[in-house]
C-alpha cells in the first residue's frame, strides 16, 4: 500500500508539473497571437513608415512632416488616441521595412501593382494613382506618349513608376517602334523634377496627383503629357497578417470620404477632388 501511495504522489507531482508547463506555453502562445492593432491599443503608441519626399502627400516643411497623407494620419491617430512615431525613410526601405516588422504600417502612398497585392494588405485608396508623364513646357519633340521612343525617361527607383515605365517600353518595342534612349532612376521624385528642368531627362513618370501639383506650382516650366496606364489608385499597406489593422484604417478612410473630410483635404493640398472607391480597385488574388 505504501508503494502505491508513493507512486501516486510521484504521478501527481509529474501531472502538476506538466500542467504548469502546458499553461506556460499556452500563455506564451496567447501573447504571441496579439495582433499589431491590439499591441497599438495596449501600448498606447504606434510607429509608422513614411517617405516624406512625396509632395503633396508627405514632405518636410519647417522641419516637420506635412501633407495630405499626414493630415489623414493625424485624423486616424486622434481616433486611436495613441502616441505617433512617424519615421521618414527612403522609399526603397519602406515596403521591406514593414514586412521586417520595423514599424506597424505604411502611412505613405503605395501604388497598386500585381506583385505587391499578394505580399501586402492594402487599405482602401486615399487618392487616384494613375501613372502619367510630364515633360518640359514647350518641348515640341514630345507630343504623345509614343514620342518617348529615343528619349530619356526618369522616375523613382523601385517605384510603380519604374515598373510601369519598363512595361510601357516593352510594349513600344513589341509594336516595332523601339525603346527609350535611357531610363534613369532616382532615390526620390523631386530629384527627377530637377533633372527634367535641367534637361538631363526628357520626361518624368509618376502618379497624376503629384504631377498635376508640380505643373500647377511651376507654370511655364513643366507640362502634363499623357497617361501611361489605365486608372488606378494609391493606398496604405500593412503586413499580410494584420488584416484587422488594415480594416480599421480602411474604415477611417471611408469615414473621412463619407463625412467630406477627404474632399476638404484634397481641396487644400491638390486643388481638385478625387473619388475614392471602397471596392473593385484591387486585382484578383489580392490579400
What name fits each language-model region?
Residues 70-79, 139-160, 235-274:
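Extended ligand-binding regions for polar small-molecule ligands
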Residues 86-96, 140, 180-194, 230-232:
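Short helix-initiation/N-cap motifs at beta->coil->alpha
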Residues 60, 73-82, 161-185, 215-217:
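Ligand-binding cleft/hinge of the Venus flytrap
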Residues 52, 127-135, 215-254, 272-287:
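Periplasmic-binding protein-like
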Residues 34-35, 160-176, 219, 223-224, ...:
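Ligand-binding clefts/hinges and TM-proximal coupling segments of bilobed small-molecule sensing domains
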Residues 93, 110-118, 164-171, 190, ...:
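A ligand-binding cleft/hinge motif common to bilobed small-molecule-binding domains
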Residues 33-109, 248-249, 268:
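Extracytoplasmic small-molecule ligand-binding "clamshell" domains
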